[in-house]
């Protein structure tokens, strides 16, 4: 007999068919807010070599052994040192520049004699929130999220141009149609973070610092030439979360994921300056996941990296020569982040020159260490300092240091201004047009303003994360080594040192920082660096780019 067909419950089947499909989870869009402009007013100080006007003290001042004030910049709130130029951001969002303008890094007309060596305003289509300077380029983030840049990038063959069209002597919109929230400059590359958590890179890629090109393409000799180098392009990491913070050293790029807090790094690693192994290779062409944790800020020079963690401690990694790591008489490469033990106080800000380093304490004390050949350390002599030393000067005595930034042969500092200083700093010019945003948004990381209120509402803004808010008042110790007495003793010496140098004899006194030729060093890392020599020509640094 034929089998009977199984009976089906038509009612149940109908109910199943009528059930609505499961609702899809709404994807929450990742979004970073624009940062706030710094608010603590400061005075600009400089030291080092000024052979191309990077000291901002006029054509006749070619050297400063100690920190000297720069006039004509009112209400300064942020600074950035390039290779041979500087940017200063004011409270109102204007930008002053001074120094070498051979390739347009100043972003303004300097056809008038002596105009490079004195601070002057850059004409921008809006007000700036933050600034960054490289060897020959400059950039800023405006209040509406646009990124403007000017100048040029360079590689081992020389000038690359800022875009495929060449150098740009005035600011141009580099990321049209994209809202950005952070920028960071290396020597010859620029890193940009968008509000969507995406990272874009542009510039020289010879050391892998762009993190997105093949070994054949990094030199610009591929099928597409330099087009892929000079057009901001997204750096994509498979399975990585959106990013919330970026940093750049001379030849490296660092990024932090928003959810995992993982730090990714790409670029030159011949002295382990990425703080991670690259399996025998000199550089990382694409980002590698590091073991760095709890990072507040990262700075670096040619072959070393300075790391500031959220517990306000300073660590270093990389090449030790000339004392740039601050660890004493160390001979071997430091492959893992090592705490600088001489910095016993809480550190709130770090900076680097090519072969030197700086740290600012919660009490506003400035430390410097490394190569002193160009007087970048600001301690009054040209000696190298193997360990951190307190910088003592009549221009910093009794004042609170805020920021430090090192260039190729000079350094720039921001010291908190008092009421009298603010009256004396009268604006030279009125800024151009602006597009001021009505709402200043809080940055996604290092919420400086809120943290500062927990430390000291009057003096410690922008200098401390929330976890350390209860300890600041107890840590205000007087400068070491009787700083007040030292400052009095150096006053007379500074008066002698601060006499204008004669142009006819200045070339004999100009010193050049130790040039770290990475290509040769990789082959012979154990070999000692030659003793730094004095420069014969001011433009010596404009040669081919060294790796």
UniProtKB/Swiss-Prot annotation:
Residues 427-436 have a biased composition (Low complexity). Its main location: nucleus. The modification Phosphothreonine is found at residues 286, 512, 531. Residues 517-527 have a biased composition (Acidic residues). Bj1 repeats lie at residues 417-454, 455-489, 490-519. Keywords: Cell cycle, Cell division, Cytoplasm, Guanine-nucleotide releasing factor, Mitosis, Nucleus, Phosphoprotein, Repeat. The keyword Nuclease does not apply. GO terms for biological process: cell division; central nervous system development; NLS-bearing protein import into nucleus; regulation of mitotic cell cycle; regulation of mitotic spindle assembly; regulation of neurogenesis; regulation of nucleocytoplasmic transport; ventral cord development. Residues 533-547 have a biased composition (Basic residues). InterPro entries: Ran_GTPase-activating, RCC1/BLIP-II, Reg_chr_condens. Residues 1-24, 423-547 are annotated as: Disordered. GO terms for molecular function: chromatin binding; guanyl-nucleotide exchange factor activity. It is found in: Nucleus; Cytoplasm. PROSITE patterns: RCC1_1, RCC1_2, RCC1_3. The keyword Cell division applies. RCC1 repeats lie at residues 41-91, 92-143, 145-195, 197-257, 260-310, 311-362, 363-416. Residues 437-464, 482-499 have a biased composition (Basic and acidic residues). One of its GO terms (cellular component) is cytoplasm. The modification Phosphoserine is found at residue 526. It comes from the Eukaryota. Promotes the exchange of Ran-bound GDP by GTP. Involved in the regulation of onset of chromosome condensation in the S phase. Binds to chromatin. This is Regulator of chromosome condensation. It comes from Drosophila melanogaster (Fruit fly).
């Amino acid at each position: 007999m034929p089998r009977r067909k199984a009976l089906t419950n038509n009612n149940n089947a109908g109910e199943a068919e009528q059930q609505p499909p499961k609702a899809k989870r709404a994807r929450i869009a990742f979004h970073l807010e624009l940062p706030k402009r710094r608010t603590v007013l400061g005075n600009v100080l400089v030291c080092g070599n000024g052979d191309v006007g990077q000291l901002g003290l006029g054509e006749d001042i070619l050297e400063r052994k100690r920190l000297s004030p720069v006039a004509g910049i009112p209400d300064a709130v942020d600074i950035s040192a390039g290779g041979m130029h500087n940017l200063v951001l004011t409270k109102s969002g204007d930008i002053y520049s001074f120094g070498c303008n051979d390739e347009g890094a100043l972003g303004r007309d300097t056809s008038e004699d002596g105009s490079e060596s004195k601070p002057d305003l850059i004409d921008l289509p809006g007000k700036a929130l933050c600034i960054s300077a490289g060897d020959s380029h400059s950039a800023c983030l405006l209040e509406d999220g646009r990124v403007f840049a000017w100048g040029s990038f360079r590689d081992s063959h020389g000038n690359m141009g800022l875009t495929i069209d060449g150098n740009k002597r005035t600011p141009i919109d580099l990321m049209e149609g994209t809202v950005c929230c952070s920028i960071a400059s290396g020597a010859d590359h620029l890193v940009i973070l968008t509000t969507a958590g995406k990272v874009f890179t542009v510039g020289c890629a010879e050391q892998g610092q762009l993190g997105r090109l093949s070994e054949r393409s990094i030199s610009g000799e591929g099928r597409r030439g330099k087009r892929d180098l000079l057009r901001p392009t997204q750096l994509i990491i498979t399975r990585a979360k959106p990013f919330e913070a970026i940093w750049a050293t001379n030849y490296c790029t660092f990024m932090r994921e928003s959810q995992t807090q993982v730090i990714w790094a790409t670029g030159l690693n011949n002295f382990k300056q990425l703080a991670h192994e690259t399996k025998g290779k000199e550089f990382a062409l694409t980002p590698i996941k590091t073991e760095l944790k709890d990072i507040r800020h990262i700075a670096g020079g040619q072959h070393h990296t300075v790391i500031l963690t959220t517990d306000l401690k300073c660590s270093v990694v990389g090449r030790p020569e000339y004392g740039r790591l601050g660890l004493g008489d160390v001979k071997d490469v430091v492959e893992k982040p090592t705490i600088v033990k001489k910095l016993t106080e809480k550190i709130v800000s770090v900076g680097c020159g090519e072969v030197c380093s700086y740290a600012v304490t919660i009490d506003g004390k400035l430390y410097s260490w490394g190569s002193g050949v160009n007087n970048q350390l600001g301690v009054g002599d040209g000696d190298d300092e193997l360990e951190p030393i307190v910088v003592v000067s009549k221009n910093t005595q009794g004042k609170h240091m805020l920021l430090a930034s090192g260039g190729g042969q000079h350094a720039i500092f921001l010291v908190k201004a008092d009421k009298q200083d603010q009256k004396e700093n009268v604006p030279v010019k009125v800024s151009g047009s602006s597009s001021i945003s009505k709402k200043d948004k809080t940055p996604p990381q290092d919420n400086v303003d809120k943290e500062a209120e927990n430390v000291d509402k009057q003096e410690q803004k922008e200098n401390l994360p929330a976890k350390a808010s209860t300890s600041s008042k107890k840590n205000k110790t007087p400068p070491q080594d009787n700083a007040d007495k030292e400052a009095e003793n150096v006053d007379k010496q500074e008066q002698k040192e601060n006499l204008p140098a004669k142009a006819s004899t200045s070339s004999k006194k100009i010193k050049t920082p130790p040039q770290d030729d990475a290509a040769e060093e990789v082959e012979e890392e154990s070999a000692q660096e030659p003793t730094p020599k004095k420069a014969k020509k001011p433009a010596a640094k404009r040669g081919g780019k060294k790796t």
